[in-house]
From Swiss-Prot:
The chain crosses the membrane at residues 1-21, 42-59, 78-98, 186-206, 210-230, 239-259. It comes from Caenorhabditis elegans. Its EC number is 3.4.26.1. Keywords: Endoplasmic reticulum, Hydrolase, Membrane, Protease, Transmembrane, Transmembrane helix. This is CAAX prenyl protease 2. GO terms for cellular component: endoplasmic reticulum membrane; membrane. The gene is fce-2.
Length: 266
């Protein structure tokens, strides 16, 4: 099997193993289902790393470094995505301050509740780590050696985004109609494709696996930008403040991407 085909199969194997380990589950948010899916994700990580390292030997003497498992510039690999995503969600944080919900981030009890939640562990810790290892560190790295970085940025996010269609079965088991599930997951496909392209670019540019992992965790925690909610704020001052915050945040985000200030380099 060629390296290009393998790079496309790795994301599929992730979804298959996650579902195989939870084949009798009825609710993906049930703690027992989450635990079983963790096992499938971890097995997929192990298999993907071994297979990718095997094929990368034809292209490099250091497969693990090529996949982004490295310690050089570790500080920048943590601070860069943290600052980058804080800029992207600046408007969101200002919105939370106006809504008086920003304090949740500084409350120990709230953090304790989060860490005790299996769903939170999946969405913020295990999900971003295991998905980025398979989709970015393994699949995109191997694909880039076969098709080049530009084609990889365009192609690699497709299986990542399409993998979310498997939630249609979860939705139906929870009582949602097929039409509702398809529409919801179709929209999810669109924005996860965009994120996948962004994360793939981060992986190939920085060669640090932790960079897209942190960006992924940040996006899972914050969700989509809520600029469409701004007109619902009754006070004109709040609306102007939010429009300004989102604009400044997006501008800073683009500036950091364009100039690559603070970005770790391999």
């Amino acid at each position: 099997m060629g390296a290009g085909l393998v790079s496309a199969c790795l994301p599929i194997s992730y979804v298959l193993l996650v579902h195989l380990f939870d084949r009798n589950g009825t609710d993906r948010n049930d703690p027992e289902s989450v635990k079983r899916r963790f096992k499938g994700a971890l097995l997929s990580n192990f298999v993907s790393i071994v297979v990718t390292a095997f094929y990368l030997r034809d292209y490099t003497d250091s497969p693990m470094l090529e996949m982004g498992v490295r310690w050089d510039n570790i500080g920048q690999s943590i601070t860069y995505p943290f600052i980058l995503m804080n800029a992207f969600y600046l408007g969101q944080f200002v919105m939370m301050q106006i809504d008086r919900t920003l304090w949740h981030y500084f409350d120990w009890y709230e953090w304790k509740l989060c860490f005790n939640s299996w769903v939170w562990r999946r969405d913020i810790i295990v999900g971003p780590i295991t998905e980025e290892i398979v989709f970015r560190a393994c699949s995109s790295t191997l694909m880039a050696h076969v098709y080049g970085p530009t084609m990889t940025i365009l192609l690699n996010p497709i299986p990542f985004a399409a993998s979310h269609f498997h939630h249609i079965w979860d939705d139906q088991r929870r009582g949602y109609s097929l039409a509702h599930s398809i529409l919801q997951r179709g929209f999810q496909f669109c924005y996860t494709y965009l994120f996948g392209a962004f994360a793939t670019w981060l992986q190939l540019t920085t060669r640090h696996a932790i960079v897209p992992i942190i960006a992924h965790a940040f996006c899972n925690a914050q969700g989509l930008p809520l600029w469409l909610e701004i007109p619902n704020y009754p006070k004109r001052r709040d609306r102007l403040t939010l429009y300004a915050a989102y604009s400044v945040g997006f501008a800073a985000f683009v500036h950091l991407l364009y100039t690559r200030n603070g970005m770790p380099t391999p």
